[in-house]
Amino acid sequence: MADYKTIRGTSTFEYEEKRSRFIATAAFADTEEKALAVLNAVRAANRTARHNVYAYVLQNGHTRYSDDGEPAKTAGTPVLETIGHAGVADVIVVVTRYFGGILLGTGGLVRAYTAAASGALQQAELVSMRLVVDCSVRVSYAQFEQAQRIIAAAETRLDEPVFDDAVTLCWRMPAGQEGALCTALNELTRGGAEVEISEPQYAAF
């Protein structure tokens, strides 16, 4: 499964077109349930708004959008396309419109929804997501420093060691790269090291 980019947390951006206010909220959402929770929260915070247009793209390929009463293809579709052009996934963008009394026409609506969604995504912090595994191993105090060097020399994110009757080392690394590291640790400990490896998961790395 391929690495991908998403955003961290939530970002907002406001765009105005002929007195209509377009307030875009972009948020991380890696499931449909989380995406809809963001949508419902934005709706609840903007009960007097005319429209709450949204689109989301999940890493698994699932997408969804809504014009929420705007003319077809003038609102939800531009928001969805903006997410696609940004090259991100596991993202929902909700654009709340407060009507300003002047009709914008189809071209004006497309421009406004695109600008609002694009602004929110540009404000967001991008994060690279990789398929990773979390690993841990217990080694003796005599083996600790060399084991730590072996782990640190690989592409890993190494946590602080935990000291008790032995030393526990925990780290995160890209899935599929753990085999060589396990071999090196087994050689160091003469087969005494039992590396625990989690199921692969997507995480910032």
Report residues per predicted region.
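Short amphipathic alpha-helix segments
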Residues: R138-T156
